[in-house]
Amino acid sequence: MQTVEKLTTETLEKPLIIAGKKFTSRLMTGTGKYPTIETMQQSIEASKCEIITVAVRRVQTQAPGHKGLAEAIDWQKVWMLPNTAGCQTAEDAVRVARLGREMAKLLGQEDNNFVKLEVIPDSKYLLPDPIGTLQAAEQLIKEGFAVLPYINADPLLAKRLEEAGCSTVMPLGSPIGSGQGIQNAANISIIIDNSTVPVVIDAGIGTPSEATQAMEMGADALLINSAIALAKNPPIMAKAMGMATESGRLAYLAGRIPKKSYATPSSPVTGKINTTTSE
């Protein structure tokens, strides 16, 4: 029987592997919505994440709050995950992904072919386009990208993307920035059970307890941005999310007790002290 110490050590040493690249942290974070670049830097450090997603469109612009974003992060310590946020069509997403790959190379990550694929024509609910996502993924895979697609919690689409060659699938827990938590638990569980690539739950997580819940379900990793960046104290929330992610992973590997409809005593019933008195 494994001891708690042995299980913990093995868990911490077992890496998350995406497209052949190993990561020890299972929490990914972003760069958007922070009040200042300094707060973003502190939060990234506190989270202990190793993958940071960056919107290619944000880095390309010189608008206030965007300038110097890429340079504010030490890309020797963390892996860049360029994303195609803002793209409404498959064609647009492919073009932006190509820019993202070049951007990663300019920042010193010559072998970085990662892209977080987002095709979102819906501006109100920010729900991803399944057809456009699959079309863009197929093209990007042909061009040698490691594609991490953001999708609805659709088990059939997840399998199609996996079969197309995607490096992960990234089902949403609930709409981006909503903080509604895991609203698609049944479908996400099906995706996890049937996937042979890492499943990264992306969007909707609002609290560390929800992050733990997602990892307890068997997710391989989480991508959390808004819940950290919009917290009253982002660095502290980032630390909490990092700890919650690790805690949930350990709980999943340890295995929870089965639920029962009746009580079971914690103490043994054998050897009870006779408390009755004889007359």
Curated annotation (Swiss-Prot):
Cellular compartments annotated: Cytoplasm
What are the entry keywords? Cytoplasm, Schiff base, Thiamine biosynthesis, Transferase
Annotated positions binding 1-deoxy-D-xylulose 5-phosphate: 177, 203-204, 225-226
Query: One biological-process term from Gene Ontology?
Result: thiamine diphosphate biosynthetic process
Query: Where's the active site on this chain?
Result: 116 (schiff-base intermediate with dxp)
- Which family, according to the similarity comment? Belongs to the ThiG family.
Its EC number(s): 2.8.1.10
**Pathway(s) it belongs to:** Cofactor biosynthesis; thiamine diphosphate biosynthesis
What is this protein's function per UniProt? Answer: Catalyzes the rearrangement of 1-deoxy-D-xylulose 5-phosphate (DXP) to produce the thiazole phosphate moiety of thiamine. Sulfur is provided by the thiocarboxylate moiety of the carrier protein ThiS. In vitro, sulfur can be provided by H(2)S.
CDD domains on file: ThiG
MF terms in GO:
thiazole synthase activity
Q: Which Pfam families match?
A: ThiG
Recorded superkingdom: Bacteria
Species of the source:
Trichodesmium erythraeum (strain IMS101)
What stretch or stretches form a coiled coil here? none
GO CC annotation? cytoplasm
Q: Which reaction does it catalyse?
A: [ThiS sulfur-carrier protein]-C-terminal-Gly-aminoethanethioate + 2-iminoacetate + 1-deoxy-D-xylulose 5-phosphate = [ThiS sulfur-carrier protein]-C-terminal Gly-Gly + 2-[(2R,5Z)-2-carboxy-4-methylthiazol-5(2H)-ylidene]ethyl phosphate + 2 H2O + H(+)
Q: What class of enzyme is it?
A: transferase
> How would you summarize the oligomeric state and partners of this protein?
Homotetramer. Forms heterodimers with either ThiH or ThiS.
Q: Identify this protein by name.
A: Thiazole synthase
